[in-house]
């Protein structure tokens, strides 16, 4: 079943969560680990594959516990976005390179 566009009136879906909100979620997860004194590799960069793997596993294991609350939507369950989050966690390039790749892919064939 294809997801419907979010109307912000009730159930919010995968089209509703922005990349910046996902990045903020990653920062909050790392802050939670620091707060609980679980500090192993919390300073690891996302591209440091070996060191950041424990953080990735923690995020994956706890997706069902996270909810994003903003002024446009009161509750957005993060677990509904698991594929998108997995893709972001799997990026092996800096974001500038990833942005250039996506933009060139999207706008390679101009239709307007």
Curated annotation (Swiss-Prot):
GO terms for biological process: regulation of DNA-templated transcription; viral life cycle. It holds the Pfam family Baculo_LEF-11. The keyword Transmembrane does not apply. Keywords: Transcription, Transcription regulation. InterPro entries: Baculo_LEF-11 (IPR009429). It comes from the Viruses. Belongs to the baculoviridae LEF-11 family. Involved in late/very late gene activation. This is Late expression factor 11. The gene is LEF-11.
């Amino acid at each position: 079943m294809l997801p419907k566009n979010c109307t912000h009136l009730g159930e919010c879906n995968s089209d509703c969560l922005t990349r910046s909100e996902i990045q903020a979620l990653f920062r909050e997860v790392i802050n939670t680990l620091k707060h609980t004194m679980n500090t192993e590799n919390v300073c690891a960069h996302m591209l440091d594959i070996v060191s950041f793997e424990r953080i990735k596993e923690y995020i994956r294991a706890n997706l069902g516990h996270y909810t994003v609350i903003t002024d446009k939507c009161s509750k957005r369950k993060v677990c509904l976005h698991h594929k998108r989050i997995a893709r972001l966690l799997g990026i092996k390039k800096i974001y500038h390179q990833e942005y250039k790749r996506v933009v060139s892919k999207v706008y390679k064939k101009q239709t307007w």
